[in-house]
């Protein structure tokens, strides 16, 4: 079963996860490419894994699906 992209009370949704990652990285949506978002279970906690590239950098985020908190993030030269 696919989660609702707009989210629920327990799930912020794909669009919000993407927006949190882009805002944190300081990248606008039209500057990002190769965007990948997936919902994953990390030891019983649902997290969105968000990855994208922009301006020669590769960004990777883990975002708590219930709270929107950034659990882990990396930026490296692509």
Q: Over which residues does each language-model region extend?
A:
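Long, terminal "pre-/pro-" and other extracytoplasmic accessory regions
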Residues: 1-78
